[in-house]
Amino acid sequence: MAKPAAKTKKKIKRVVTDGVAHVHASFNNTIVTITDRQGNALSWATSGGAGFRGSRKSTPFAAQVAAEKAGRAALDYGVKSLEVRIKGPGPGRESAVRSLNNVGYKITNIIDVTPIPHNGCRPPKKRRV
């Protein structure tokens, strides 16, 4: 006897007017995630996922392309304004914020949430080239 076909629920697109853009800019890559106020992810993109490999991933242009990609995907949810939270010392910090502004979002505020140790772990030794 054949099993009946499983019914799939239609995914409901929720409407979110204001969101939060989390920009994680490391030295090697840039990750841009756009969430709602509760932290549920709406869209995300990375420099590596945007087609950049190797040392080109860590450029400001790669961060710009990744932020545009994540921003355009979040437009489907009706996001109009963004609060930007930047974490990390990477080269794509400013360019990601600029490109989110160019996509058409109203940037309400920009917060730097880079974790700063109170003299925690010992840093890695210096490179000798």
UniProtKB/Swiss-Prot annotation:
InterPro entries: Ribosomal_uS11, Ribosomal_uS11_bac-type, Ribosomal_uS11_CS, Ribosomal_uS11_sf. Disulfide bonds: none annotated. GO terms for biological process: translation. GO terms for molecular function: rRNA binding; structural constituent of ribosome. SUPFAM superfamilies: Translational machinery components (SSF53137). Keywords: Ribonucleoprotein, Ribosomal protein, RNA-binding, rRNA-binding. One of its GO terms (cellular component) is ribosome. Part of the 30S ribosomal subunit. Interacts with proteins S7 and S18. Binds to IF-3. NCBIfam families: PRK05309.1 (NF003698), uS11_bact (TIGR03632). Located on the platform of the 30S subunit, it bridges several disparate RNA helices of the 16S rRNA. Forms part of the Shine-Dalgarno cleft in the 70S ribosome. Belongs to the universal ribosomal protein uS11 family. This is Small ribosomal subunit protein uS11.
